[in-house]
């Protein structure tokens, strides 16, 4: 039995003339044109028979059009059984599920670091190539990805587009919102064996544990000072560069970190959000509460290596040690 073939009546463009497939003009083309790039491009265009009614984009397969249309409809039929997050494409769900399974099949040939998705590996490889084409006009800092520049720019604008639907708290990065939302869902699964503190991510608990171990893996190339956290090193390095990108709108004073700016702004607002549970006294900064609590606990963590005398504050120890130095100089 002879198989019937459907004759699709779609239009294509050739030499600014609209031709219909199967016409005499089209059949008269020279066979030698089959290898011509322009002709091949036209043939490929003819194959794109499935057109999106929203934006006009064309596809050669109906399945590809169906997936594309989800951009306009917002449909996300592929749902993760672990956390409920939904996706418009099945491949995105496959990559997402690796978060739960821990599978990281894409490995960097330079440093051996592994990733759950190929796109994550490609972005990471920009670190090794050193290519940083996206530069911040405010402070000159450069990034290998446009997304990195967009996130960084919020440092200057103060924009926090990611809000928690539970409590309204806003964040500048979606990853910070995700970690915060785990608190509401009760998913603080990472626990410190030393003090019992829990965190929403493995990286945060690893950073925290360095408080107990004393490990400071991040070293400044300029002065050799070491730090527990990478972000603290970054803030410190701005001192060497004399870079202070965080500026107070009230008085113009500038700071090396957003945290220091927020603490400073409370001078103008009078806000004292940190309260002592023992006596009810309030403070502008968490560090002030920690120092104040020692008046209740009688803790004296700063000990003199010369005579063993202990002090509540580091400034008291420094002042005490000067006496030993003076005694050595006069003796």
Swiss-Prot record:
GO terms for cellular component: nucleus. Residues 1-35 are annotated as: Disordered. Residues 1-12 have a biased composition (Basic residues). PROSITE patterns: ZINC_FINGER_C2H2_1, ZINC_FINGER_C2H2_2. GO terms for biological process: regulation of transcription by RNA polymerase II. The keyword NADP does not apply. It is found in: Nucleus. Its main location: nucleus. Keywords: DNA-binding, Metal-binding, Nucleus, Phosphoprotein, Repeat, Transcription, Transcription regulation, Zinc, Zinc-finger. GO terms for molecular function: DNA-binding transcription factor activity; RNA polymerase II cis-regulatory region sequence-specific DNA binding; sequence-specific double-stranded DNA binding; zinc ion binding. The keyword Ubl conjugation does not apply. The modification Phosphoserine is found at residue 23. A zinc finger (C2H2-type) spans 50-72, 78-100, 106-128, 134-156, 162-184, 190-212, 218-240, 246-268, 274-296, 302-324. Belongs to the krueppel C2H2-type zinc-finger protein family. May be involved in transcriptional regulation. This is Zinc finger protein 660. It comes from Homo sapiens.
């Amino acid at each position: 039995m002879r198989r019937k073939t459907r004759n699709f009546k779609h239009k294509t463009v050739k030499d600014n003339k609209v031709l219909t497939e199967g016409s005499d003009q089209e059949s008269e083309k020279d066979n030698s044109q089959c290898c011509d790039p322009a002709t091949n491009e036209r043939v490929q265009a003819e194959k794109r028979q499935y057109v999106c009614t929203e934006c006009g984009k064309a596809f050669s397969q109906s399945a590809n059009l169906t997936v594309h249309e989800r951009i306009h409809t917002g449909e996300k039929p592929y749902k993760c059984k672990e956390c409920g997050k939904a996706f418009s494409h099945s491949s995105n769900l496959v990559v997402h599920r690796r978060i739960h399974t821990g599978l990281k099949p894409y490995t960097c040939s330079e440093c051996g670091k592994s990733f759950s998705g190929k796109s994550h590996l490609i972005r990471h490889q920009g670190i090794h190539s050193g290519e940083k084409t996206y530069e911040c006009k405010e402070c000159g800092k450069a990034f290998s990805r446009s997304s990195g520049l967009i996130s960084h720019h919020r440092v200057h604008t103060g924009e926090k587009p990611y809000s928690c639907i539970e409590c309204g708290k806003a964040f500048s990065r979606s990853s910070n919102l995700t970690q915060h939302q785990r608190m509401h869902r009760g998913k603080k699964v990472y626990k410190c064996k030393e003090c019992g503190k829990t965190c929403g991510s493995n990286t945060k608990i690893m950073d925290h544990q360095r408080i107990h171990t004393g490990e400071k893996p991040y070293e400044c190339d300029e002065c050799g000072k070491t730090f527990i956290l990478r972000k603290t090193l970054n803030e410190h390095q701005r001192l060497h560069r004399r870079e202070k990108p965080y500026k107070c709108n009230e008085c113009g004073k500038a700071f090396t970190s957003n945290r220091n700016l927020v603490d400073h702004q409370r001078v103008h607002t009078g806000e004292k959000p940190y309260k002592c549970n023992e006596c009810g006294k309030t403070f502008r900064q968490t560090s002030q509460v920690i120092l104040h609590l020692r008046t209740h606990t009688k803790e004296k963590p700063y000990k003199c290596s010369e005579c063993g005398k202990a002090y509540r504050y580091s400034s008291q120890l420094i002042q005490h040690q000067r006496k030993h130095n003076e005694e050595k100089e006069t003796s």
